[in-house]
Each structure stands twice: as structure tokens, then as C-alpha cells.
């Protein structure tokens, strides 16, 4: 029970419907999104500034940009419909906004999978000074 409470606290204040996104990341990469990507580089986790540190961090940068383009619903609170088929995620439902959020999460999960080899522990919990340079545009 204590583990569930800690997980719930960790999920507070982080972007997106984390449970669905977490499941997508786990399905596509075999890794826990919370454990591996919640505080990585300049963009993985809450907020994002500066230059992406590597291809994995760029996945988070692109995900942030994707969320920034969504209009008509809140990516931070939305629950969408999706299914997993073999090694892919299929976004469903009739709501275009929710489907767009799902596609943002799907693309990030695939990006994490495709860039597993770029993950470098030196970018875990980087000092905030590392991410102070001006961000590139989406």
C-alpha cells in the first residue's frame, strides 16, 4: 500500500494522463516511464527548457511540443481510448482532441523504444543550470 501512495505522489504535477502514458511506454520500450524518464535531461519530467541532451531527451522535447499544439482539451487531464496490437499502439475514439493527445503519447513511446541505445545515466537528474540556454522552437 505504501508503494501505491508513493507512486501517486510522484504522479502529481507531471504532465499528461500518466497512467495511460506509462502503460504505452512500458508496452513499447519495456521500461517504466516513471523510473527511467521522469527526471531525464532537460525535457523528460515536469517542464522543459534548454537544449535536448540526447535523442532520448529529444523524444520528450517533441512530446512537449506535441502537447503544446493540442487545442480543445487538456492533455494533462484527458483520458483517451487506445489499444495495443502486437508491437504497436492504435489510438481510437471519436474525439479528435483526445485522439491527438493519444498520438502524442504514442509517438513518444515509440521514440523511447527506438532510442533505447541513446539513454545515458549521466543525463539523469541533470543540474538545472544545464538547461538554462534558450529553448529551440518547436
UniProtKB/Swiss-Prot annotation:
CDD domains assigned to the protein according to its UniProt record, in alphabetical order: PLA2c (cd00125)
The keyword Signal appears for this protein: yes
Catalytic function, reaction form: a 1,2-diacyl-sn-glycero-3-phosphocholine + H2O = a 1-acyl-sn-glycero-3-phosphocholine + a fatty acid + H(+)
A GO biological process held by the record: arachidonate secretion
Cofactor: how and how many bound: Binds 1 Ca(2+) ion.
Signal peptide: 1-16
SUPFAM superfamilies: Phospholipase A2, PLA2
Record InterPro entries: PLipase_A2 (IPR001211), PLipase_A2_Asp_AS (IPR033112), PLipase_A2_dom (IPR016090), PLipase_A2_dom_sf (IPR036444), PLipase_A2_His_AS (IPR033113)
Free-text tissue specificity from the UniProt record: Expressed by the venom gland.
Entry binding sites for Ca(2+): 43, 45, 47, 64
Molecular function via GO: calcium ion binding; calcium-dependent phospholipase A2 activity; phospholipid binding; toxin activity
Cofactors required: Ca(2+)
Xref: SMART domains: PA2c (SM00085)
Record-annotated active site: 63, 105
Keyword annotations of the record: Blood coagulation cascade inhibiting toxin, Calcium, Disulfide bond, Hemostasis impairing toxin, Hydrolase, Lipid degradation, Lipid metabolism, Metal-binding, Platelet aggregation inhibiting toxin, Secreted, Signal, Toxin
Localization in the cell: Secreted
Family, per entry: Belongs to the phospholipase A2 family. Group II subfamily. D49 sub-subfamily.
Subunit structure of this chain's protein: Monomer.
Record function comment: Snake venom phospholipase A2 (PLA2) that impairs hemostasis. It weakly inhibits ADP-induced platelet aggregation when tested on platelet rich plasma from human and rabbit blood (15-25% of inhibition at 5-10 ug of enzyme), and dose-dependently inhibits blood coagulation, possibly by inhibiting thrombin activation. Exhibits high hydrolytic activities toward L-dipalmitoyl phosphatidylcholine. PLA2 catalyzes the calcium-dependent hydrolysis of the 2-acyl groups in 3-sn-phosphoglycerides.
Protein name: Acidic phospholipase A2 Tpu-E6a
Native source organism of the sequence: Craspedocephalus puniceus
Amino acid at each position: 500500500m505504501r508503494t501505491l501512495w508513493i507512486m501517486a505522489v510522484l504522479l502529481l504535477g507531471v504532465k499528461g494522463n500518466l497512467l495511460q502514458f506509462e502503460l504505452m511506454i512500458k508496452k513499447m520500450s519495456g521500461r517504466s516511464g516513471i523510473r527511467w524518464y521522469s527526471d531525464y535531461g532537460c525535457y523528460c519530467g515536469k517542464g522543459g527548457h534548454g537544449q535536448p541532451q540526447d535523442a532520448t531527451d529529444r523524444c520528450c522535447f517533441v512530446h512537449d511540443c506535441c502537447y503544446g499544439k493540442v487545442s480543445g482539451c487538456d492533455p494533462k487531464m484527458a483520458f483517451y481510448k487506445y489499444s495495443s496490437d502486437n508491437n504497436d499502439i492504435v489510438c481510437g475514439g471519436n474525439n479528435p482532441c483526445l485522439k491527438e493527445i493519444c498520438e502524442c503519447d504514442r509517438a513518444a513511446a515509440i521514440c523511447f523504444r527506438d532510442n533505447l541505445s541513446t539513454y545515458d545515466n549521466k543525463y539523469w537528474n541533470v543540474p538545472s543550470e544545464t538547461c538554462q540556454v534558450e529553448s529551440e522552437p518547436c
